[in-house]
Amino acid sequence: MAGGQLNVLSTLDQAKTQWYHFMAIVIAGMGFFTDAYDLFCISLVTKLLGRIYYTDDSKDTPGALPPNVSAAVTGVALCGTLAGQLFFGWLGDKLGRKSVYGFTLILMVVCSVASGLSFGSSAKGVVSTLCFFRFWLGFGIGGDYPLSATIMSEYANKRTRGAFIAAVFAMQGFGILFGAIVALAVSAGFRHAYPAPSYSDNHAASLVPQADYVWRIILMFGTVPAALTYYWRMKMPETARYTALIARNAKQAAADMSKVLHTQIEESADRAETVAVGGESWGLFSRQFLRRHGLHLLATTSTWFLLDIAFYSQNLFQKDIFSKVGWIPPAKTMNALEELYRIARAQALIALCGTIPGYWFTVAFIEIMGRFWIQIMGFAMMTAFMLGLAIPYHHWTTPGHHTGFIVMYGFTFFFANFGPNSTTFIVPAEIYPARLRSTCHGISAAAGKAGAIIGAFGFLYAAQDQHKPEPGYPRGIGIKNALFVLAGTNFLGTIMTLLVPESKGMSLEVISQEVADGDDEEAAYPK
């Protein structure tokens, strides 16, 4: 876009924080609340699924999902998410943010319910049906990443834009916590109604038939808050930046935002016509794109990829780490529902003490410290805490030192969320031109999910004991060495962050070089 900025976009940039900003945070944030609930609640119920469908009463230990089944159940939604991020990111730039936004929510709600209703006459049938619906659930979740980030970015003023996008993403923390709370409540209720002995006391009686309802209720419950926001999601007008810069209808954008901001915004016919005919048209991966944004795309994809290797390998399999350090007793000493209860309690404590505070520290400090320095700090601190876990690992696993391990582990999550887990979501929504913003955010997010898949699938095998792996698994490098690998991954993330531009306090059109602004242009690059 040549020349200065449109009146409607300038008005949005300068707007005071008001009610519609908070409505946008809630509407977009509840999608992320559901995303996190749906993605992470599966880690709560995999042990229960193993007991229900793969228990052999003649063995001394409860049933567990075979390695290939466990990998499929935990990872298939991530595969769907990757595909959804690419597809809906592209579609959001082609059809508009709003028109695609409602469809992703419907897909999430339907597939979440269907996951809980998975059927089959055998264990294989149930798991296959579950994986099918969780893939498409992930596909819908994937669409929420680029669309929610882009919508919030394009609605916000430039002074608090980072905090608003971070607040949307921070709803993930509440989604993870809510999943743990639901699992705690459901398992506690069923334990009270259907008491059972431990597996070691009575193999068959330790698993009550009603346990099959428990995992289904947990998987389906996340649809409730998402469904409640559908009406408001559909009432949101299309973003002014899409309407003005992509649909080339600046007058309509001004009219839409006049209603939202409760102020009269005038857009001259001459200025609107200039935008309609004068916008740049170079496409994704063109020479002009690579010259302006090639390093930016390398930065946002690589840092998100590296972050998610570490983040998802910890988060999806933290229950196994808790078992090693003694927070969750051996499975045979518990019945099925008690094991679920203890896993959920551990996840709730980590979410409450490490995950959620980190997200909201980002909200509080991102407009003070900036995106670049928060991301550098987060990766560096994650590296340090991972090394602090790995180097004296045997010390942490000896009796009397388990609490120290949990504290260190919690700080790792804190600095992931007060760090790259938040900023890798925020930056791609700010630094690309409007016509490619959703697409590039989707590409960056998909790179992250590729890292998550490596973390989720790879950690199952890599963290196995070098001498006594779990049944069905080959020997791995052990948790200690896996923690060293994750520390190295985080250090690489620190290095790649040097390519990330700073976008604090700047108009989206200045950051993406769609308008010239000599005063702000230098700020697009970290000092």
Swiss-Prot record:
Extracellular side: 43-70, 121-124, 185-211, 314-348, 393-405, 464-481
Domain of life (superkingdom): Eukaryota
Stretches in topological domain Cytoplasmic: 1-21, 92-99, 146-163, 233-292, 370-371, 427-442, 503-527
Induction trigger: In roots by phosphate starvation.
Biological process terms in GO annotation: phosphate ion transport
Tissue-wise expression: Expressed in roots, stems and leaves.
One GO term describing the cellular component: membrane
Transmembrane segments: 22-42, 71-91, 100-120, 125-145, 164-184, 212-232, 293-313, 349-369, 372-392, 406-426, 443-463, 482-502
GO molecular function terms noted in the UniProt entry: phosphate transmembrane transporter activity; symporter activity
UniProt membrane topology term: Multi-pass membrane protein
InterPro entries for the chain: MFS_dom, MFS_sugar_transport-like, MFS_trans_sf, Phos_permease
Localization (cell): Membrane
Keywords tagged on the record: Membrane, Phosphate transport, Symport, Transmembrane, Transmembrane helix, Transport
Alphabetical list of CDD domains matching this protein: MFS_PhT
Additional comment: Plants overexpressing PHT1-1 accumulates almost twice the amount of phosphate in the shoots compared to the wild-type plants. Although related to the sugar transporter family, it does not transport sugars.
Cited function: High-affinity transporter for external inorganic phosphate. Required for phosphate acquisition in plant.
Family the entry assigns: Belongs to the major facilitator superfamily. Phosphate:H(+) symporter (TC 2.A.1.9) family.
Protein name (record): Inorganic phosphate transporter 1-1
The gene coding this protein: PHT1-1
